[in-house]
């Protein structure tokens, strides 16, 4: 049984993420799909119940899935979601994020920070769905890897749990300005380890010698018709580094396709 938790504040961005997730698992019968909401008080609970029931009925009727509603009063959203993910032994959390346009700066920061905090919790992979993303069949997935300590840092099982939902073609990409005509022995060894881990997907490898990770990833996504991007954040100071450096933050905020963050 695959459990997916979709936290929602009942905003358009969160509803879009829920619809994306429901479409993604349409027709998969062993999925436990949990809509989760935190309300502030009894008055808020009454209106939230109506909206949650409405969203549940929409998702079930359109996508032929069984949806479970879980609601709680107050508390920290991220801590609550983490608790629910551990309780349900979730394999995936799906959250929406606001892009650079269309929303206020305050809303961008708030929604972005909640999503990134959830990634930092490292309870299970988090699928970040852009506010404008529409679901299309997931045929091509790109895994970005730094090819360092693959044996210990690559979260093979959590990534496979998600990939097995749709069995896509897997493209494994490394961006490094020091790549020349041939790979170093170190890169060849790490390539072999990645191939062994993901051999059932028959991955294709790409070593791109450029400086700009974000621009290169965006170009690759467009050229190869990539439907989902996978990143593997490092444990050390992930949340802080996202806001102090530009690469991962830009990658998430500017992406037009979902990004799966699976912690090492």
Go through each PLM region and give its residues.
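Charged helix-capping and loop-helix junction motifs
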Residues: 51, 110-114, 156-157, 186-190, ...
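Short, flexible loop segments at boundaries between secondary-structure elements
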Residues: 254-264
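Short, well-structured alpha-helical segments in soluble
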Residues: 80-88, 216-224
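Small/aliphatic-rich secondary-structure junction motif
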Residues: 1-46, 140-206, 226-228, 254
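Charged docking surfaces used in two-component/phosphorelay signaling
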Residues: 71-79, 211-214
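Short secondary-structure boundary segments
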Residues: 37, 97, 174, 233-234, ...
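Glycine-rich, Arg-bearing micro-motifs that act as flexible, cationic patches
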Residues: 96-117, 232-254
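Hydrophobic alpha-helical segments and helix pairs
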Residues: 83-132
């Amino acid at each position: 049984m695959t459990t997916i938790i979709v936290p929602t504040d009942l905003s358009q961005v969160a509803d879009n993420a829920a619809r994306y997730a429901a479409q993604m698992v349409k027709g998969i019968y062993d999925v436990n799909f949990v809509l989760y909401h935190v309300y502030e008080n009894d008055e808020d609970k009454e209106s939230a119940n109506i909206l949650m029931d409405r969203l549940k009925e929409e998702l079930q009727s359109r996508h032929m899935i069984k949806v479970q509603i879980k609601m709680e009063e107050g508390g920290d959203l991220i801590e609550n979601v983490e608790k629910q993910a551990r309780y349900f032994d979730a394999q995936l959390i799906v959250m929406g994020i606001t892009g650079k346009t269309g929303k206020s700066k305050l809303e961008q920061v708030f929604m972005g920070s909640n999503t990134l905090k959830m990634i930092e919790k490292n309870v299970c992979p988090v699928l970040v769905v852009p506010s404008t993303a529409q679901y299309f069949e997931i045929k091509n997935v790109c895994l970005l890897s730094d090819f360092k300590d693959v044996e210990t840092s690559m979260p093979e099982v959590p990534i496979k749990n998600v990939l097995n939902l749709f069995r896509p073609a897997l493209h494994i990409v490394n961006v490094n300005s020091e790549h020349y005509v041939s790979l170093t022995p170190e890169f060849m060894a790490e390539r072999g380890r990645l191939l062994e881990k993901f051999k059932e997907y028959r991955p294709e490898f790409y070593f791109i010698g450029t400086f700009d990770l974000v621009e290169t990833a965006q170009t690759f996504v467009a050229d190869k018709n990539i439907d989902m991007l996978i990143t593997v954040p490092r444990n050390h100071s992930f949340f802080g580094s996202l806001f102090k450096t530009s690469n991962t933050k830009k990658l998430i905020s500017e992406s037009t396709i979902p990004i799966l963050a699976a912690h090492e």
